[in-house]
């Protein structure tokens, strides 16, 4: 099992604004979110299959606690409450499906994967739009 623990800084981001657009975020809020999320600070604490992930930007900070295979509460990237379930899909990769608690919207999910060279790849999806963010240890 890989060790996701550590402080991470973003090295590369693709399609973040496109994903926000797919979620229905208006243009002005998308521009603010893209600017604010250009240098997120991510802290991950892992104890076996239990995770704590804190993501901080200039606009907001989110924190999630979860255990692989157990449903938990979190928010979609645009702030809507959802129930989530993370599972291992390979030795180095977890995938999480999100179900909105209220209303309709695109199907959302995320994955986190450790590469052999120590990078952390976060993918976030909204229907068929995929955002990829690559992090390195800080």
Swiss-Prot record:
Protein family (similarity comment): Belongs to the calycin superfamily. Fatty-acid binding protein (FABP) family.
Compartmental location: Cytoplasm
Residues reported to bind all-trans-retinoate: 133-135
GO CC annotation, single: nucleus
InterPro entries assigned to the protein according to its UniProt record, in alphabetical order: Calycin, Fatty_acid-bd, ILBP, Lipocln_cytosolic_FA-bd_dom
Any GO BP: fatty acid transport
Pfam assignment, any one: Lipocalin
Coiled-coil portions: none
One example GO MF annotation: retinoic acid binding
Main location group: cytoplasm
Organism of origin: Xenopus laevis
Entry domain remark: Forms a beta-barrel structure that accommodates hydrophobic ligands in its interior.
Sequence motif Nuclear localization signal, location on chain: 21-31
Tissues where this protein is expressed: During early embryogenesis, expression is generally restricted to tissues which are sensitive to retinoic acid (RA). During gastrulation, expressed in an anterior domain in the neuroectoderm in a region that will generate head structures, and in a posterior domain that contributes to tail formation. During neurula stages, expressed in both the presumptive telencephalon and rhombencephalon, and faintly around the developing cement gland. Also expressed in branchial neural crest cells. During tail bud stages, non-uniformly expressed in the telencephalon, mesencephalon and rhombencephalon.
Official protein name in the record: Cellular retinoic acid-binding protein 2
Function of the protein: Cytosolic CRABPs may regulate the access of retinoic acid to the nuclear retinoic acid receptors.
Keywords recorded for this protein, A-Z: Cytoplasm, Retinol-binding, Transport, Vitamin A
PROSITE patterns, per database record: FABP (PS00214)
Superkingdom of the organism of origin: Eukaryota
């Amino acid at each position: 099992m890989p060790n996701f623990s550590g402080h991470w800084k973003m090295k590369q981001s693709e399609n973040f604004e496109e994903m926000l657009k797919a979620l229905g975020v208006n243009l002005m809020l998308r521009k603010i979110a893209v600017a604010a999320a250009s240098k997120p600070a991510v802290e991950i604490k892992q104890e076996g299959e239990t995770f704590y992930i804190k993501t901080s930007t200039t606009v907001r900070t989110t924190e999630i606690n979860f255990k692989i295979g157990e449903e938990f509460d979190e928010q979609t990237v645009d702030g809507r409450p959802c129930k989530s379930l993370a599972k291992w899909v390979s030795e180095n990769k977890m995938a999480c499906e999100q179900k909105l608690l209220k209303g309709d919207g695109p199907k959302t999910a995320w994955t986190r994967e450790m590469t052999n060279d120590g990078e952390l790849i976060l993918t976030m999806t909204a229907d068929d739009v995929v955002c990829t963010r690559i992090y390195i240890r800080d």
